[in-house]
Each structure stands twice: as structure tokens, then as C-alpha cells.
Amino acid sequence: MKTKPKSAYRRILLKLSGEALVGEEGFGIDPKVLDRMALEIKSLIEVGVQVGLVIGGGNIFRGAGLAEAGMNRVVGDHMGMLATVMNGLAMRDALQRSHVNSRLMSAIPLNGVCDDYNWAKAIRYLKQGTVVIFAAGTGNPFFTTDSAACLRGIEIEADAVLKGTKVDGVFDADPAKNPDAKLYKEIDYQLVLEKELKVMDLAAFTLARDHSLPIRVFNMNKPGALNRVVLGEDEGTTIKHCETIIEKE
């Protein structure tokens, strides 16, 4: 009889950038990437992990960019929130086609499109093994989807925020510019701030730090990386309260 792998986490908040959905399309959503991610998330449900999900909207719209060009920042951020809802609808559809129960909850009311965000219902769905997708950020302008991920992670009492990126984790320098950059295995929140390592925006990062919510940074484009992270294998970088820095060989 085949035994089910034991996960390192009971409940996670998975944060994906909107750009992660682009694939080779250059803009919008690549259906092949969406389906691959849905299958990776399905593998987590199959080992008993409860999954909350926040997706950015940068593949469709970036409010901050147009704000610099003169658009009112509040209007731009509202448009960005709607972009995250579009990504959430696409992911919900991909999950359901992969036979994974999922609910889409929006921080702004969109009757007939998705559910309103409700903390108690979200917890209930998670306990039932349903993937809960949190869309529209925090519902407020001037807050990023990274802030939304940390906020929802704290609210649902996630064991960690898993941040899927284009790189293998957190490095001591930009790996694109410095081929000798070292990858951290574990690092303390304070050292990330002191070294000015780019993980997420300051508001999101300090929120996670103040609530002792670990952040795990990994490469979502690497096949199987998400599964390895959840199973506690040596993948990516963990940011938490710790006294020593652990670098990978």
C-alpha cells in the first residue's frame, strides 16, 4: 500500500505574481501555465494541505505605472484589483477543470461573479479541502497584493506564505547581475531589512514579521518546486525569526 507523503505545512497562503501566468504569451494568461499551476495545487490538496491563494494582476494591469503617468492612483489601484479578479476567475476555472473544489472571494463586492470575502466562510472552505482564492487585494488602494497575501495569511492562520517568483529564492545580490550571488536557505526578517534584499514591499514584509508569519520564496517556474517546498525539502529560502543565516552550498 502506497503511503501518502507527509507535508511540512497544514495550511498555506500561496502568493503568485500575475506575471507568473504569462508564460510565453508576453501578456495576459497562458492557458498551459494556468493548467500546470492548477495541477501543482491539486497535488497539495491530495497530501492534505489546505491552500489559500492570492494572485497579482500585473499581467493585465498595473495601477502604479499609470499613476506615474498622471492617472489618479485610487482609480488605477481599483483597476488593478479588477485585474486580480480576472486572474482569480481563470484560476478557479482551471482548478475546477482539474477536479479541484475552489471558491473565489473578492475584497470588493462583485455579485454574480464571485463571493464576497468572509473570514469564517474562508476557514470553513479550507477545512473542507477547498482551495480559496482571495481576489481584489485588501479592497483598499495603496496596498499591494503582497500585503493582501500577508494579511490573508495572518487571518486564516496559515503556517507560512509561499511566494512563487521567477528566481530560486533570496540571494545576497541580484543573480541576474552577479553570477556569484549566494542563495540563502534561511534568513531572519531583520537581516532582510538591513541588507535591503528585495522580497516584497515594506508594508507587507513588516506585517509578516510582526505576526511571526514565515515567508518561503521559491521559483514557481521550476516544475515540482511547490511540491518540494510543501513536503519540507531543500527548496527556496525561508524567512523567519532565526539567530543564524544559513546559506546553500
Curated annotation (Swiss-Prot):
Keywords assigned by UniProt, alphabetized: Allosteric enzyme, ATP-binding, Cytoplasm, Kinase, Nucleotide-binding, Pyrimidine biosynthesis, Transferase
Main localization (coarse): cytoplasm
GO MF, one annotated term: UMP kinase activity
Pathway in which the depicted protein is active: Pyrimidine metabolism; CTP biosynthesis via de novo pathway; UDP from UMP (UMPK route): step 1/1
Bilayer-spanning residue ranges: none
Catalyzed reactions: UMP + ATP = UDP + ADP
Single GO biological process annotation from the record: UDP biosynthetic process
E.C. number(s) listed in UniProt: 2.7.4.22
Protein name: Uridylate kinase
Organism of derivation: Psychromonas ingrahamii (strain DSM 17664 / CCUG 51855 / 37)
Record gene name: pyrH
